[in-house]
Swiss-Prot record:
Lineage: Bacteria, Pseudomonadati, Pseudomonadota, Gammaproteobacteria, Enterobacterales
Recorded consequence of changing residue 89 to A: Strongly decreases affinity for substrate and DHNA-CoA synthase activity
Protein family (similarity comment): Belongs to the enoyl-CoA hydratase/isomerase family. MenB subfamily.
Species this protein is from: Escherichia coli (strain K12)
Biological processes per GO annotation: menaquinone biosynthetic process
Residues at the site labelled Important for catalysis: 97, 258
Protein task: Converts o-succinylbenzoyl-CoA (OSB-CoA) to 1,4-dihydroxy-2-naphthoyl-CoA (DHNA-CoA).
Cross-referenced SUPFAM superfamilies: ClpP/crotonase
Name of encoding gene: menB
Binding site for hydrogencarbonate: 154-156
Descriptive protein name: 1,4-dihydroxy-2-naphthoyl-CoA synthase
UniProt keyword Lyase present: yes
InterPro entries named among the record's database cross-references: ClpP/crotonase-like_dom_sf, DHNA-CoA_synthase_MenB, Enoyl-CoA_hyd/isom_CS, Enoyl-CoA_hydra/iso, Enoyl-CoA_hydra_C
Length: 285
C-alpha cells in the first residue's frame, strides 16, 4: 500500500464488519489492509471470559491467514477500558475461568502466544483502563498507542493471582527489574505519561485522536516490506524466546494457585467488594 502524501495517512478508514458469529468481540477489516479486534464487554470494563478469548483467537487466526491484511489492531469497546483482565465473576475453584459448560480455562495464555507468533504486527490501541491480564495483553502486542486517559497496572496479588510468565519476565525486560517489582508487588496504577516514561507504550495521544493516530501508524507499516517486518518480529522475539517455556510453567503454577484457599480469598474479596484478608496465610521462609 502506497500513501503518496502525509495527509493520506490520516484519511478516514472504511471498516467492514466481519463479526458474524461472535458474541464477545467485534471484528472488522479495512479496505487498505488493517484488521481490528475489539473486546466488546464494556459493562465489565472489557474483562475477558473464556468465550472472549476463544473469539479473539479465532479472529487473530483469520487476520493472520488473510493475505489482504498486513497489520492487526487490538482494542476495547468504548473509552473507559482497553481490558481489565480476567472476569473474576467466572473464575472458578479448579484452576481457571469457567465457560458456560463449567470447564475451566486459562486460554488467555494461548492468545498471548498467538500474538507473539503472528508474523504480522499487532498494535494495542488503549483507552482507559489496561489492568491485570489486560495490561499483559497490551504488553504482548508489538506496539502500544495510548490515549491520554489510559491507566496501566497489575492487580494480581490483590485478587489472589499472578502472571509469572511473560507478565513478569517480559515486563522486566521492558521497564527493568526494579520497576517491574514495584508494579507487581504494590499493584499501583500509572497514567499514560508515566507509562510512556517507563517504555510501556510507544506514544500518547489525545483520546479524540486515538484511532486516527493508530491507523496512521498501521498505514506507515503497510508501506514497508512484509517479509522484512515478519523477520524483524521473529528476531526481536528471539531475544526473549526462553520466556515461552517460563510462560508454560508459570501458567500451570497459576492454575494450581487458583485452587488454594489463599488464591480464592483474593477472588472472593474482589467479587464481594471488600479488602482481602491474607493475614491468615503463613509467610513461609
Amino acid at each position: 500500500m502506497i500513501y503518496p502524501d502525509e495527509a493520506m495517512l490520516y484519511a478516514p478508514v472504511e471498516w467492514h464488519d466481519c463479526s458474524e458469529g461472535f458474541e464477545d468481540i467485534r471484528y472488522e477489516k479495512s479496505t487498505d489492509g488493517i484488521a481490528k479486534i475489539t473486546i466488546n464487554r464494556p459493562q465489565v470494563r472489557n474483562a475477558f471470559r473464556p468465550l472472549t478469548v476463544k473469539e479473539m483467537i479465532q479472529a487473530l487466526a483469520d487476520a493472520r491467514y488473510d493475505d489482504n491484511i498486513g497489520v492487526i489492531i487490538l482494542t476495547g469497546a468504548g473509552d473507559k477500558a482497553f481490558c481489565s483482565g480476567g472476569d473474576q465473576k467466572v473464575r472458578g475453584d479448579y484452576g481457571g475461568y469457567k465457560d458456560d459448560s463449567g470447564v475451566h480455562h486459562l486460554n488467555v495464555l494461548d492468545f498471548q502466544r498467538q500474538i507473539r507468533t503472528c508474523p504480522k504486527p499487532v498494535v494495542a490501541m488503549v483507552a482507559g483502563y489496561s489492568i491485570g491480564g489486560g495490561h499483559v495483553l497490551h504488553m504482548m502486542c508489538d506496539l502500544t498507542i495510548a490515549a491520554d486517559n489510559a491507566i496501566f497496572g497489575q492487580t494480581g496479588p490483590k485478587v489472589g493471582s499472578f502472571d509469572g510468565g511473560w507478565g513478569a519476565s517480559y515486563m522486566a525486560r521492558i521497564v527493568g527489574q526494579k520497576k517491574a517489582r514495584e508494579i507487581w508487588f504494590l499493584c499501583r496504577q500509572y497514567d499514560a505519561k508515566q507509562a510512556l516514561d517507563m517504555g510501556l507504550v510507544n506514544t500518547v495521544v489525545p483520546l479524540a485522536d486515538l484511532e486516527k493516530e493508530t491507523v496512521r501508524w498501521c498505514r506507515e507499516m503497510l508501506q514497508n516490506s512484509p517479509m522484512a517486518l515478519r523477520c524483524l518480529k521473529a528476531a526481536l522475539n528471539a531475544d526473549c524466546d526462553g520466556q515461552a517455556g517460563l510462560q508454560e510453567l508459570a501458567g500451570n503454577a497459576t492454575m494450581l494457585f487458583y485452587m488454594t484457599e489463599e488464591g480464592q480469598e483474593g477472588r472472593n474479596a474482589f467479587n464481594q467488594k471488600r479488602q482481602p484478608d491474607f493475614s491468615k496465610f503463613k509467610r513461609n521462609p
